[in-house]
From Swiss-Prot:
The organism of origin for this protein: Novosphingobium aromaticivorans (strain ATCC 700278 / DSM 12444 / CCUG 56034 / CIP 105152 / NBRC 16084 / F199)
GO molecular function, one term: isomerase activity
Localization: Cytoplasm
Quaternary organization: Forms a cylinder of 14 subunits composed of two heptameric rings stacked back-to-back. Interacts with the co-chaperonin GroES.
Name the record gives this protein: Chaperonin GroEL
UniProt-listed NCBIfam families: GroEL, PRK00013.1, PRK12849.1, PRK12850.1, PRK12851.1
Residue spans of biased composition, Gly residues class: 535-547
GO aspect biological process, one term: protein refolding
Catalysed conversion reaction: ATP + H2O + a folded polypeptide = ADP + phosphate + an unfolded polypeptide
Family in the record: Belongs to the chaperonin (HSP60) family.
Length: 547
């Protein structure tokens, strides 16, 4: 086992604080509408230019092991804020640096670290209450667009595209971000439920130009098992033919003879039919077939439920306004399912999301939720160069997470003013002793740091800006760094999601509290052995080999 290097007390805290400062100073230059870019060198390819706080934080690794501990703890703050709200990483980093600095100064002056931490926790709870009380729900797509614009550093097109996508697929819908081939932003929206299974035979195609199957007002047979023979299906097939409507069969698989029979019937014109494989695998397949059944007001034909193919009636089949199938995807538009049943199914999936511990399962459940509740939108981000596309994609991702957070918990005035005005909630608040009261005071000063940094990045004195605002009575009044003016920020569209501001503060306080209460730090000692000498070059005694 390698020898360890152990640092205690002030020495440990000072080393850790140096690491915190290095990471925070690199991240905080990106804060606000006039924040600067950071260039990150890559071991291969072009350098990456970004204004995304968490991307900068993830790249920082320091040589000194103790300084690196501080940097990595602060990186954890940015990552946690990113995971919880998807944005606010730079704000969280600035807050954490401010709390750690003030806290370590207080500890060096002889205060009890545990009481300081208790005071910090009391103050954070009070500020969170204040933020929730002042939060207002998002009203309409113009405010959604505005949140996106602010998060994307004033890029109007980004905010508008996100608002448009949310309008089309609903607030629960899936919105993904991809890189485009061209220069422009594009928005592709798939309405209805889409799953990644195409037609089983090209003979089912009804639109040769687009190479798609289009079924208007079809019945949908949802079968859990394989179909190898159509014998059991004959009664339901005859009923569908008599109804004069098309039929879509969704089954685990349709094998040789059964598929050949369907194709022959389709080609002879007696049966408007198409067949696709069921989406997913194992238990997830069952769940997705259940979703399709709910959406189309059909029943899943499963022997587990005691339903056999021979006894299926038209009433058991699902229905939809239109089904479109290409070689890769099937889209069901406007299923006949009742709103109440779909809502109940959505709530059931939501409950599963709450209890699952697996990120993969959560992602798949959210996909199912979106397919039931709304649809899928893809924002394609274009640009002149690969570097520009990646930088814009970072900003679109941030903006998308921020708008989702705004829809979830509402909005507060932006630009760091929500936290600045929350200092008023801490006035006169006392802890159980002087050290706890000092902890409350640390938070009161720290929550002024974001607005000071935004002002500093815009070329103003942060202390003057925060002082001017604290004299204001209207809490919507703030400093708009984009235009260098004091104005009503809500009216000017400078707004932040409450969830982003709240999680930034809670995550910053959580990690800062741990750093302040650190009394010893242990790291592996560097190896003192000299490096091995390089291998000797050439192969001696091999003369006469000059060709």
């Amino acid at each position: 086992m390698a020898a360890k290097d152990v640092k205690f007390g002030r020495d440990a805290r000072e080393r850790i604080l140096r690491g915190v400062d290095i990471l925070a100073d690199a991240v905080k230059v990106t804060l606000g509408p006039k924040g600067r870019n950071v260039v990150i060198d890559k071991s291969f390819g072009a350098p990456r230019i970004t204004k995304d706080g968490v991307s900068v934080a993830k790249e920082i690794e320091l040589k000194d092991k103790f300084e690196n501990m501080g940097a990595q703890m602060l990186r954890e703050v940015a990552s946690k804020a990113n995971d919880a709200a998807g944005d606010g990483t730079t704000t969280a980093t600035v807050l954490a640096q401010a709390i750690v600095r003030e806290g370590m100064t207080a500890v060096a002056a002889g205060m009890n670290p545990m009481d300081l931490k208790r005071g910090i926790d009391i103050a954070v709870g009070k500020v969170v209450e204040n933020l929730k009380a002042r939060s207002t729900p998002v009203a309409g797509s113009s405010e959604i667009a505005q949140v996106g614009i602010i998060s994307a550093n004033g890029d109007t097109e980004v905010g508008q595209k996100i608002a448009e996508a949310m309008e089309k697929v609903g607030k629960e819908g899936v919105i993904t971000v991809e890189e485009a081939k061209g220069l422009e932003f594009e928005l592709d929206v798939v309405e209805g439920m889409q799953f990644d299974r195409g037609y089983l035979s090209p003979y089912f195609i009804t639109n040769p130009e687009k190479m798609t199957v289009e079924l208007e007002n079809p019945y949908i047979l949802i079968h859990e098992k394989k179909l190898s023979s159509l014998q059991a299906m004959l009664p339901i097939l005859e009923a569908v033919v008599q109804s004069g409507r098309p039929l879509l069969i969704i089954a685990e698989d349709i094998e040789g003879e059964a598929l050949a029979t369907l194709v022959v019937n389709k080609l002879r014109g007696g049966l408007k039919i198409a067949a696709v494989k069921a989406p997913g695998f194992g238990d997830r397949r069952k769940a997705m077939l259940g979703d399709i059944a709910t959406l189309t007001a059909g029943e899943m034909i499963s022997e587990d439920l005691g339903i056999k193919l021979e006894s299926v009636t038209l009433a058991m089949l699902g229905q939809a306004k239109k089904v479109t199938i290409d070689k890769d995807n099937t889209t069901i538009v406007d299923g006949a399912g009742s709103a109440e049943e779909i809502k109940a199914r959505v709530e059931q999936i939501r409950a599963q999301i709450e209890v699952t511990t697996s990120d993969y399962d959560r992602e798949k459940l959210q996909e199912r939720l979106a397919k039931l509740a709304g649809g899928v939108a893809v924002i394609k981000v274009g640009g002149a160069t690969e570097v520009e596309v990646k930088e814009r994609k970072d900003r679109v991702d941030d903006a998308l997470h921020a708008t989702r957070a705004a829809v979830e918990e509402g909005i507060v005035p932006g630009g760091g003013t929500a936290l600045l005005y929350a200092t008023k909630a801490l006035e006169g608040l006392k802890g159980a002793n002087d050290d706890q009261t000092k902890g409350i005071d640390i938070v009161r000063r720290a929550i002024q740091a974001p607005i000071r940094q935004i002002a500093a990045n815009a070329g103003h004195d942060g202390a003057v800006v925060s002082g001017n605002l604290l004299r204001e009575n209207d809490e919507n009044q703030g400093f708009n760094a984009a235009t260098d003016t004091y104005e009503n920020l809500k009216a000017a569209g400078v707004i932040d999601p409450t969830k982003v501001v709240r999680t930034a503060l809670q995550d910053a306080a959580s990690v800062s509290g741990l750093l302040i209460t650190t009394e010893a730090a242990i790291s592996e000692k560097p190896d003192d052995k000299p490096a091995m000498p390089p291998m000797g070059g050439g192969m001696g005694g091999m003369g006469g080999m000059d060709f």
